Design a protein with these regions (language model features):
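Short alpha-helical hairpin
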Residues: 1-7, 29, 79-81, 85
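Conserved alpha-helical segments that form or flank metal/cofactor-binding pockets of metalloenzymes
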Residues: 42-78, 143-151
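Short, contiguous alpha-helical
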Residues: 127-155
Length: 156
């Protein structure tokens, strides 16, 4: 829990959580639309898990920000909204969507979410929440890379 004299820190953590919940919610919605247009049953199955994780991450972040006295108000960035639009577009191939998503990620394990967790170190509960969510995100990225490689090998 945050120290009682940590109002500025609380506000900062609420802002981090708010931005994160908005991004995860937008991602879950876009992946849901991708699932509807996806023709590969393997990809569809994995995307269902990713969508469920993203929706749960959004709910967890929102619950934490509310516990800290905040209200969700953030919207996804323009860049994220544009990416979600491509992911949700039935006219874009699954391979292209995977390539676009994976191309935005660093090759190393350290991610923007790791940085977000570090930024929340002053709040032990939020920090632990974000560290655990980071593990989920890494699993999703590993699976997306595996699927991209499989689709590339198959030429589909």
């Amino acid at each position: 829990m945050l120290r009682q004299d940590a109002a500025p820190e609380r506000a900062r953590v609420i802002g981090l959580l708010d931005a994160f919940q908005a991004a995860e919610r937008a991602g879950a919605e876009a992946v849901g639309r991708w699932i509807a247009a996806c023709s590969d049953p393997r990809l569809r199955g994995g995307l269902r898990v990713i969508r469920a994780r993203d929706a749960r991450h959004a709910a967890l972040a929102e619950a934490r920000l509310r516990a800290l006295g905040g209200e969700p108000a953030a919207r996804p960035s323009r860049e994220l909204a544009a990416l979600c639009g491509v992911v949700a577009d039935p006219g874009v191939s699954d391979r292209s969507k995977l390539a676009l998503l994976l191309g935005r990620l660093p090759a190393r394990e350290d991610t923007a979410l790791d940085e977000l967790a570090r930024e929340a170190e002053g709040d032990a509960e939020t920090h632990a929440l974000l560290e655990t969510i980071t593990d989920d995100e890494r699993a999703s990225v590993r699976w997306l890379r595996h699927m991209h490689e499989a689709l590339e090998r198959e030429g589909t």
